[in-house]
Structure formats: structure tokens, C-alpha cells
Amino acid sequence: MYETKIKAIDLFCGAGGSSFGATKAGVDVVAGFDMWDLAIKTYKANFPKAEVFQTDLQKLTDEEIRQFKSSIGNIDLILASPECTNHSKAKGNAERDEESKMTAFEAVRFARVFRPRWMVIENVTEFESWDKFKDLLENLWELKYFVKKTIINAKNLGVPQSRERLFLLCSLTGKAAEPAAEYVITKPASTIIDNSGKYKFTPLRKPGRAENTIHSAERAISVLGNNTSFLLVYYGSGRKKNKGWQSIEEPLGTITTLDRFAYVTPSENGHVMRMLQPEELKLAMGFTPDFQLDSIPGLTRRDRIKLMGNGVCPPVMTKVVKSLVKNG
């Protein structure tokens, strides 16, 4: 086991899911990098001791990366979550940005300069089918990293969300182990729903409600009965499979950057509904309540949903980092 404090930097840090998880594993995350101003704002609020750099990594010269190295100093770990939208099946048939896909190679450039003992690269599972994926692996091998490829579903590590992601676990020691299988009681979506009355409901069958919404709700009610709450699912690959709804006794479907889950519950005047709110999505990602999101000024509800949808589940990164360090 590594006995000294592990120092890390977080590339494409977003709101800080990877950093939050690594911190829970005992890591000192000393710097975060992202180009979205609102992600930077959120990251700064939650990691006040870290240096935070708003920059487009693809536009950095090698000399500028060396200057970052001089400023930050030696590190032991790089966390990297390159752009994933253009790999994801959630993109559908929309045009793909090939240049954005190349952000994965920025992790290699930073590793070449910083030479950390370990590196974790996280992305959607479709990342593996990218035509440059083999080139990425070869670049890592050239830097003498042993690379372990693993797919982890967050629901299997105690997160109340089904979120499957690919992790590349990289180690210079020739050892890189994925988290050991554990028996974890699956957490249902019901655990993240706020029933305090804080959020406003509207009638399910109010005038103007979309027919597809009503039809999905009726399918759920036909299965569950009139007295059971459920979730409507908008957009995404899981919508068709689940016929537009899901039980709250199952982990939440995958959170994306879209507003895609509505909570429906019976009332004295018939079923009422509301969209899940960012603070609920935060809990469904595995963040603890003390992580700042709604309290940060200048962010719209849409911004907060996007920050969560683009994020990494902290408990997963905690397990990944602990396993990597323990075995390397």
C-alpha cells in the first residue's frame, strides 16, 4: 500500500465527481482542469484548496504542459474523463465531432510530462469501439503503463443509479486491479426522492400534457395499480425498453445531460407529477449532501442537470482508486 499522501490532478474535471471520489479514498487532488466556466465555478466551490485552470487542453502546447508541471510539482495520479458525448449512443444519429473524441489523447500528453505512477481514464462504454482506441492503448503502452480495462456499473457499488462506464486503469508498476466484487444491496431510486413537499407538483392529466406522457403513465399504473408512485422516463435508450417508465424500487436509469425523469405519485385528487430536481440527481450520482450544487449562484437548473449528467459517480472512483493504489 502507498504510505505517503497521494497527489492527483483531474483533467476534464467537470463539477468534480472524480475528485470527490478520489478525495474519499485519501487522495489530495491538487488541481483541476476544464474549459466550461460553470464547471470551473462548481469545482472551485467544492475544492477550495485545489488550483483550478479554465483551459482547452487540446490547445495547450507541450511547453505549456511543462509549465503546469513546474507550477504544480510532482503528482502520483492523473484522473481523466475526456469528452464522451461524441462516443455515446445517447448522441443518437446526430453528427459526431471527431476532434472532440481526440481529447482522450490529452491524458497521454499530460502523462508524458507528469509521469504519474497511476492514471484512471473514464468514459462511456462505446469508447472502446472508437477507431482510435487501439492507438490510445498503444500510446499508454509506449509510456510503460500496464493498462487494465474494466466496465463498472455504478449500481453494483452502492450507487442508486444504473450507470455503466468504461475505466482504463493504468499503472507503471505492472499491476492494475479493478475493484473486487462485493455483495452490495442495490439502492433504489426511492432513496433519492425528496418527499418533504419542497418541490411543486402539477396534475398528471392537466390540459396540454403530452399524449406520450399520459400513455406511459397509464402503462405504469396498469402494472403497479393506482396507489404506487413511479418514474416516467423521457429520452434515452432505456425509454423504449421500459415503455417510458420505471419503478422507484429499482436504481434510477442513467442520468444524462437532459431532463429525463419525472416523479409521479398518487394524491387525493388523482396522480400528480414533477421532474426530478438537481439535488435529487446529485444523490443519485452518489454525491453526499454536503457537495455544493444548488447553493452555487449563477447556475440555472439546466446547468446543474448538465453538470450531473456529465459527471463521474464518486463512490465508483473511490473504489477504483483504492484498488489501483492497493495493488500498485
Describe each model-derived feature in a short phrase.
Residues 32-33:
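The conserved SAM/SAH-binding core of class I Rossmann-like methyltransferase domains
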